[in-house]
């Protein structure tokens, strides 16, 4: 078997008949499969053992040789080789065809490769192949030319004979007529009888004339056809062809069927044809040139590589190994068989019948019919249903052909090569494991035992609990007591992988250390639920076991959940308290006025209350019942760092652990701060979710991951503890309807009535009335909402849950306690009747129905969205899968400019809202300099939160940062241009598959994006596409619906306002030609512009526009932006437009991910003029190849090629990849393979998919060559130490090195272990 590590490219080409015969182990001659009585394969049949190998290991067919000792012998009785049965998976046979057939892929594919090569229209080609027309294969021009005059004379003689014969016949008939009429006259017949006779005679003469004329025309046709006869000419009329053959058979040869195609190919001169086509392209115009270009692609492909076009016509058909098309016996003696066997049987039957007919010398028409049937059966075998009706099996189901085995989700590529089932895995329901640490999961004992079975068995043998593996296996199966102890030992520090489907991003698989638990459910840490998107309502998860030491190390270092706290999409923590935990911490840090034991100044009667010397003392007061944790107290703290301002005031030198200071706070907040690292400044405020997030964010920026992991774990424990004690529950009695509601409703009812009356009077039309009502009821809903919020008391659990940020929002509470408000119909328009009741009061029947309208739409939407979003992710992964970080720095000076703040008129700075997703986590491309010329942050520095703060303080508004859009690395990107990895907060590693991370980051929130197209204020008509469809439209580079024109030049606008259309003319500043935009529909509004004086208004006559500015509302066409503004601008345009959609849904994704995808969309150049290069004009080529070829040509002193960048949609870009394996496994498998085979494509195995398909390690992460080829070489000292012979006095053997040898615990503090992070 071929070892995948010993080849580094894979080529596909056309197989010739010779190749097919060389692969084959014998010819399949009979359609028989298995003898139903003996259940043994028939000789020479589709399962023949002589051809494909024995069905049983080391046993021949007749049983003469059994046992392995006869290995390699070929039995002389039955001819079967004695070998393993698994050769039946790899040995092929073949069928020798009695007549050649064409390969349907090359004839019927679009475009038809055979048609392009032979310059025949596909319709004509079909007529030839399926025996509907003859084609002229060769003409002996010379002989015809020499003998033309003789032949012409012969033809004239023949025509004269026909004419003479006609004249003689007519003469005779005319005489007979005269005689007849004379006779009738003599008899005195009536005139009508005479007329009848006369008419009859004339009719016969007319027929004679016509018959002769037809004969003459026929001769003319034969003669003109013959004189103009040329190769590749079709003759559909069979009689004409027969005549030609009879008369002039020696001057030409003609044929039909695939044989004729084969003959045409034999005489086809590829080099001459290619030269002709190149000449046509140089001199031709229009359609002719286009056709020549298309044909040259195919012709040049055959010219460039050693493929012979003869491979498109087959003389032999390969038969795939029988194990790949098995036949199994069912209960009841029937057989279930693969469809391929049926298709092969049809081919063999027809082939054998054709052989017999040829041997019998059957008439041509019968033989041709049989040949046509053979051609059709081979077509069905290769690609059933491609031409005509598909061949069906029992129950009218189309049979699955060889092409169908490759195609689609169930095909070979996607089902078996890219997605495999793995052993050492299991799945079970998940339950919550609040007692676990962040890096642990609970694994059911039985599951663990089954997963770790081989390890347990080995260990049992090592420990002498079992004599051999067999008895160890028996012990494990009987679950003896020792087994559990060994299992505990084996699983220690052996991480397992947990995965929850759908795995939308890389955090859908994480590694945990297993803890054995009773029961059958996997226990999951509550903080990782967000990353897995898991909940405990019956979700299931799969467990996988990394086996090798390397796999375990990678799982532990890269995938352990405590190393995956940050989201790869935005770089913000994902593992943070949510739901109950948030409520608990919110409750803990609350400050209640007037609570038991709160701080009170001393009075005459009482001393000062609520002052404590330490948190411990305050805790005692709580235990005594004299204080509650929410009460305000004054307490002296020594183990917590004071906030920045207090630290600066009290400890100018800086605070040290143990320095005391007093704080006015609550005990709850002190307890909360004890959960944070000791040197984190004290946080003295209430903790809703947002605030908790900022703290964890901050920790992630400033502390090692391990500290963050420990902290979130502590927060989780405290959160659950205090959530329990907060007593937050939700009951219907907690839902309080505000008493002011009735009054509010009344006033708004009155306003609505007014509108209604105006409408009745005809003062408003329907649209105006609807928008007025929508406005009124939106206000009413807001009013009720405000009244409801004000009416809820502080200790009510419902607003507490919402305010803490644990779950829900005020809109949902408003539906419960206020009023539901306006709802939409399925079109997305507001229904002007609101739902006035709240859920607590109960809805009326009508309200219930209009409410279900929107709800049902929502559910349907969600279902569609999930599928769409999954498909988007798949396309994104495919287009970006080979973007891998290849080097540290490509050394480019280029970058993009991002805004970090805006200066206001009063000189103050407003931080840009999108710094987090645009500038953060990048590398500076140029020094950031303030107004005085001081360098604040130098070039090449990483922009984290501290650096950005420094820039803002210095008053810098824009910085130039490195970006993957400007990276000059050939394949992939460089680490400096990419910036830091969002998931680790450090510069991205070489080998990181940033393309796939980008695709997952964009695809994972896809399901949250809406489907709907939004209506502008209830106006039907041109909708603005939003949500997921808009993202797809952008990534597929489609022309948007309702596209807006952009200014081709800078200049003054002249606006003409027609009755249905606008007409905009731009007069360029440089005095060039005017640009006119005509027929701009009034349904689209004019664009709002910011003017120099700071005001905003619609575009008007006389305004000045800059090049590339949009003139109307709507979306600009990216192809236009590319044409007018160039590639850099279109990239930035696409990134911003995609971000628009995600931001509108509150999803935070870093720009760099979108940039990675957009970079892939602009990888190609279309060739305009090929210069001295090999490129064909009009072809697409990689930018890197284009530039390399031009450099080479210029160095040789030639003319470089000219090209222009093209923007390709992600689907098209994926299919246009250099790797045919990757493209074939994506979409349109047969088309990709057809194309690759003709071009003899070679796959260099650079991307990830190709390597997964052939089973190599992917060239990313630790699979990249620079990591695979590392060898460890010890230094001299290490060598000396390794081979040193210890003596007795150097303490090597004495235990004093570490601790006393008394067996007591070792006091670690004596050894100076750091206590920074205790």
Swiss-Prot record:
Its EC number is 2.7.7.6. Zn(2+) 2 binds at residues 890, 967, 974, 977. Its cofactor is Mg(2+); Zn(2+). Keywords: DNA-directed RNA polymerase, Magnesium, Metal-binding, Nucleotidyltransferase, Transcription, Transferase, Zinc. It comes from the Bacteria. It catalyses: RNA(n) + a ribonucleoside 5'-triphosphate = RNA(n+1) + diphosphate. GO terms for molecular function: DNA binding; DNA-directed RNA polymerase activity; magnesium ion binding; zinc ion binding. GO terms for biological process: DNA-templated transcription. It is an enzyme of class 2 (transferase). Binds 1 Mg(2+) ion per subunit. The RNAP catalytic core consists of 2 alpha, 1 beta, 1 beta' and 1 omega subunit. When a sigma factor is associated with the core the holoenzyme is formed, which can initiate transcription. DNA-dependent RNA polymerase catalyzes the transcription of DNA into RNA using the four ribonucleoside triphosphates as substrates. Belongs to the RNA polymerase beta' chain family. This is DNA-directed RNA polymerase subunit beta'. It comes from Rhodococcus opacus (strain B4).
């Amino acid at each position: 078997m071929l070892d995948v590590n010993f080849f580094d490219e894979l080529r596909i080409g056309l197989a010739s008949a010779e190749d097919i015969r060389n692969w084959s182990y014998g010819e399949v001659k009979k359609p028989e499969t298995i003898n139903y009585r003996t259940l043994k394969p028939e000789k020479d049949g589709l399962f023949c053992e002589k051809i494909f190998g024995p069905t049983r290991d080391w046993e021949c067919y007749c049983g003469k040789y059994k046992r392995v000792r006869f290995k390699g012998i070929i039995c002389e009785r039955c001819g079967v080789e004695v070998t393993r049965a698994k050769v039946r998976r790899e040995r092929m046979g073949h069928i020798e065809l009695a007549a050649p057939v064409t390969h349907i892929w090359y004839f019927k594919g679009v475009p038809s490769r055979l048609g392009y090569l032979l310059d025949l229209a596909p319709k004509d080609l079909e007529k030839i192949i399926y025996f509907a027309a003859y084609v002229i294969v060769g003409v002996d021009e010379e002989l015809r030319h020499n003998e033309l005059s003789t032949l012409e004379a012969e033809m004239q003689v023949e025509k004269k004979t026909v004419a003479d014969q006609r004249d003689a016949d007519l003469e005779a008939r005319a005489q007979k007529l005269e005689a007849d009429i004379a006779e009738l006259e003599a008899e005195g017949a009536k005139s009508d009888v005479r007329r009848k006779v006369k008419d009859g005679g004339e009719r016969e003469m007319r027929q004679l004339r016509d018959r002769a004329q037809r004969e003459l025309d026929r001769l003319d046709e034969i003669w003109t056809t013959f004189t103009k006869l040329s190769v590749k000419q079709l003759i559909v009329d069979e009689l004409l062809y027969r005549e030609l053959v009879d008369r002039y058979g020696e001057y030409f040869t003609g044929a039909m069927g695939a044989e004729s195609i084969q003959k045409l190919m034999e005489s086809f001169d590829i080099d001459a044809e290619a030269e002709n086509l190149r000449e046509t392209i140089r001199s031709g115009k229009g359609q002719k040139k286009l056709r020549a270009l298309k044909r040259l692609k195919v012709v040049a492909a055959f010219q460039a590589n050693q493929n012979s076009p003869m491979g498109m016509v087959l003389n032999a058909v390969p038969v795939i190994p029988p194990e790949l098309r098995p036949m199994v016996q069912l209960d009841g003696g029937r057989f279930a068989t693969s469809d391929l066997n049926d298709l092969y049987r049809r081919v063999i039957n027809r082939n054998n019948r054709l052989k017999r007919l040829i041997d019998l010398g059957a008439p041509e028409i019968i033989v041709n019919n049989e040949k046509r049937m053979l051609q059709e059966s081979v077509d069905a075998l290769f690609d059933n249903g491609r031409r005509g009706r598909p061949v069906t099996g029992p129950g009218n189901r189309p049979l699955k052909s060889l092409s169908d085995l490759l195609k689609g989700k169930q095909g070979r590529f996607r089902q078996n090569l890219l997605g495999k089932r793995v052993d050492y895995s299991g799945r079970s329901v998940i339950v919550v494991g609040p007692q676990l640490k962040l890096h642990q999961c609970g694994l059911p004992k039985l599951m663990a035992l089954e997963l770790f079975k081989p390890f347990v068995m080995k260990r049992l043998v090592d420990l002498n609990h079992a004599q051999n593996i067999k008895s160890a296996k028996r012990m494990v199966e009987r679950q003896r007591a020792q087994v559990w102890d060994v299992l505990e030992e084996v699983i220690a520090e052996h991480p397992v992988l947990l995965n929850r489907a759908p795995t939308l991003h890389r955090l859908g698989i994480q590694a945990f250390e297993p803890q054995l638990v009773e029961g059958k459910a996997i226990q999951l840490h509550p903080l990782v639920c967000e990353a897995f998107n898991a909940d405990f309502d019956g979700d299931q998860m799969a467990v996988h076991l990394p086996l090798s030491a390397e796999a375990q190390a990678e799982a532990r270092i890269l995938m352990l959940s405590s190393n995956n706290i940050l989201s790869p999409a935005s770089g913000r923590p994902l593992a943070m308290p949510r739901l109950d935990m948030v409520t608990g911490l919110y409750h803990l840090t609350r400050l209640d006025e007037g609570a038991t034991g709160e701080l009170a100044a001393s009075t005459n009667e009482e001393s000062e209350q609520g002052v404590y010397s330490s948190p411990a003392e305050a805790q005692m007061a709580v235990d005594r019942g004299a204080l509650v944790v929410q009460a305000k107290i004054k307490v002296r703290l020594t183990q917590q760092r004071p906030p920045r301002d207090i630290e600066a005031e009290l400890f100018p030198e800086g605070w040290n652990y143990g320095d005391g200071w007093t704080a006015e706070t609550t005990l709850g907040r002190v307890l909360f701060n004890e959960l944070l690292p000791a040197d984190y400044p004290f946080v003295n405020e209430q903790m809703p979710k947002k605030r908790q997030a900022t703290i964890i964010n901050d920790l992630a920026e400033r502390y090692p991951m391990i500290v963050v992991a420990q902290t979130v774990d502590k927060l989780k424990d405290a959160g659950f503890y205090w959530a329990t004690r907060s007593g937050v529950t939700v009951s219907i009695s907690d839902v309080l309807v505000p008493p002011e509601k009735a009054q509010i409703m009344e006033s708004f009812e009155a306003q609505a009535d007014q509108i209604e009356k105006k409408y009745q009077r005809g003062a408003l039309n329907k649209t105006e009335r609807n928008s007025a009502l929508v406005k009124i009821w939106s206000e009413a809903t807001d009013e009720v909402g405000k009244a409801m919020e004000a009416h809820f008391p502080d200790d009510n659990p419902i607003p507490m849950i919402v305010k803490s940020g644990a779950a829900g929002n005020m809109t949902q509470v408003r539906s419960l306690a206020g009023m539901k408000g306006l709802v939409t119909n399925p079109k997305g328009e507001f229904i002007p009747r609101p739902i006035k009741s709240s859920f607590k009061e109960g809805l009326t029947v009508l309200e219930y129905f209009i409410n279900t309208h929107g709800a049902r739409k929502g559910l349907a939407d969600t279902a569609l969205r999930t599928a769409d979003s999954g498909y988007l992710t798949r396309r994104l992964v495919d287009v970006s899968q080979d973007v891998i970080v290849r080097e540290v720095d490509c050394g480019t000076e280029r970058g993009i400019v991002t805004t970090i703040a805006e200066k206001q008129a009063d000189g103050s700075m407003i931080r840009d809202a999108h710094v987090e997703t645009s500038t953060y986590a990048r590398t500076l491309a140029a020094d950031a300099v303030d107004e005085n010329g001081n360098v604040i942050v130098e070039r090449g520095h990483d922009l984290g939160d501290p650096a950005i703060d420094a820039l803002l303080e210095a008053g810098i508004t824009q910085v130039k940062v490195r970006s993957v859009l400007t990276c000059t690395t050939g394949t992939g990107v460089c680490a400096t241009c990419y910036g830091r990895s969002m998931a680790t907060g450090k510069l991205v590693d070489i080998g990181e598959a940033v393309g796939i991370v980008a695709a997952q980051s964009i695809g994972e929130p896809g399901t949250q994006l809406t489907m709907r197209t939004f209506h502008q204020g209830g106006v039907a008509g041109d909708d603005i596409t939003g949500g997921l469809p808009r993202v797809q439209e952008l990534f597929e580079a489609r022309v948007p619906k309702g596209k807006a024109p952009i200014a081709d030049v800078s200049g003054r606008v002249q606006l003409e306002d027609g009755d249905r259309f606008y007409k905009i003319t731009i007069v360029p500043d440089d005095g060039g030609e005017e640009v006119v935009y005509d027929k701009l529909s009034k349904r689209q509004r004019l664009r709002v512009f910011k003017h120099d004086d700071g005001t905003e208004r619609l575009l008007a006559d006389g305004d000045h526009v800059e090049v590339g500015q949009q003139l109307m509302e709507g979306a600009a066409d990216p192809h236009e932006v590319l044409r007018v503004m160039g590639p850099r601008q279109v990239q930035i345009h696409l990134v911003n437009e995609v971000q628009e959609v995600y931001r509108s849904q509150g999803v935070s994704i870093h720009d760099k991910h979108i940039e990675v995808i957009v970079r892939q969309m602009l990888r190609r150049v279309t060739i305009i003029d090929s210069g001295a290069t090999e490129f064909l004009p009009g072809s697409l080529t990689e930018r890197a190849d284009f530039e390399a070829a031009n450099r080479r040509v210029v160095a040789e002193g030639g003319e470089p090629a000219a090209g222009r960048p093209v923007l390709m949609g992600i689907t098209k870009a994926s299919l246009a990849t250099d790797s045919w394996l990757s493209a074939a496994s994506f979409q349109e498998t047969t088309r990709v393979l057809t194309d690759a085979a003709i071009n003899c494509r070679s796959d260099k195995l650079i991307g990830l998919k190709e390597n997964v398909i052939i089973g190599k390690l992917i060239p990313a992460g630790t699979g990249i060559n620079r990591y695979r080829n590392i060898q460890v070489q010890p230094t001299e000292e290490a060598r000396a130490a390794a081979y040193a012979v210890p003596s007795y006095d150097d303490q090597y053997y004495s235990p004093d090195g570490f601790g006393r040898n008394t067996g007591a615990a070792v006091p670690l503090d004596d050894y100076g272990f750091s206590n920074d992070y205790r």
